[in-house]
Regions:
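Short donor-sugar binding/catalytic loops of nucleotide-sugar-dependent glycosyltransferases
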Residues: 9-13, 216-220, 225, 235, ...
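Conserved donor-binding/catalytic core segment of Leloir-type glycosyltransferases
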Residues: 4, 207-223, 229-234, 247
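N-terminal subdomain of nucleotide-sugar transferases
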Residues: 1-54, 64, 93
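Nucleotide-activated donor-binding/catalytic signature segment of Leloir-type glycosyltransferases, i.e.
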Residues: 257-278
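Carbohydrate-associated surface elements
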Residues: 43, 170, 190
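Acidic anion/phosphate-binding donor-loop and adjacent secondary structure
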Residues: 51-52, 173-176, 190-205, 209
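An aromatic- and histidine-rich active-site surface loop
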Residues: 85, 97-132
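Membrane-proximal helix-turn-helix segments that form the acceptor-binding/catalytic region
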Residues: 113-117, 130, 144-164, 178
């Protein structure tokens, strides 16, 4: 089977997080089953931010047993990346099904248009709460306008979908308010155990000479880093903390400056170790 997977970002932009890894893992597993898989995405590059686009990245690249096709982003508003070239890439290719991940995106809108035009099945999935994500709450006027504009686009994508895959019952309930129940299937996220194997000595590589708590993820306000720092501040003088540190590892999605200020204000410089841009 020929399968097109659509996502706002792909390798090497690992800082984008969950939906990128879901798309790459899915492509890897499907290609191992002898399907022909292509990921259609943007030219977002690896960086300590979510907005570094690189025209020098290959337009087409084979990774493992699947292909990545990139097109340049001409406009980005928050995490809404506009890359019109993807439409023409997808129109020129042939596939039996499209699976788009992260439906509050320009890429998913293009995927829905292509699926309708070519009359092929569209499968969609989302992560993080389509209508309940903290990013949708208490934001500035520009962000609120953007989300309002997205609503008919999101509904069009949902209406076009043959199947909706959710990772849990919580997300299923969200989608059930927007479409019929028989479209929705719960497929829980899996773990590729081969990817969990490592020969790298983490403590040696990053010169950590003590026990540690590890936060690994994006520096974003929705990740709860402020709560974590408040908690560490409460216990920093406990005897056990004399040999234990908090290691924060990731990339900046808008919260790094505030995070560093909190660490300084709480006098946690000797308790917290920051590792930016992990490989």
């Amino acid at each position: 089977m020929k399968i097109g997977i659509v996502c706002p970002a792909s390798l090497p932009a690992t800082q984008f997080g969950g939906i990128l890894f879901l798309a790459v893992d899915l492509a890897g597993e499907l290609s191992n089953e002898k399907h022909q898989v292509t990921i259609y995405t943007t030219d977002l590059d690896f960086a300590n931010n979510p907005k570094t686009f690189n025209k020098q990245l290959p337009k087409e690249e084979n990774i493992q047993n699947f292909k990545i096709k990139r097109s340049h982003v001409w406009l980005s508003i928050k995490l809404f990346f506009v890359n019109p070239g993807m439409y023409f890439q997808m129109m020129n290719d042939q596939y039996d099904v499209i699976h788009t991940i992260g439906i509050r995106s320009f890429q998913s809108f293009i995927a829905a248009l292509i699926a309708k035009k070519k009359k092929i099945p569209l499968v969609i999935s989302d992560q993080g709460g389509l209508t309940t994500h903290p990013d949708l709450q208490n934001k500035g006027i520009v962000t609120k306008i953007l989300y309002k504009i997205q609503l008919p686009m999101v509904q069009f994508i949902i209406n076009q979908a043959k199947k909706i895959i959710t990772a849990n019952e919580y997300e299923k309930k969200i989608f059930s308010e927007l479409t019929t129940q028989n479209k929705i299937e719960v497929v829980r996220n899996g773990i590729n155990l081969e990817n969990m194997k490592s020969t790298v000595d983490f403590k040696k590589k990053y010169k950590i000479n003590h026990d540690y708590f590890l936060f690994l993820g994006r520096y974003h306000e929705v990740k709860g880093l402020d709560t974590l720092l408040y908690a560490i501040n409460l216990i920093k003088n406990h005897a056990l903390m004399s040999t234990t540190k908090l290691v924060i590892m990731g990339v900046d999605f808008g919260f790094e400056k505030k995070m560093l200020c909190m660490i300084k204000e709480m006098n946690l410089n000797n308790t917290v170790k920051i590792i930016n841009n992990p490989p």
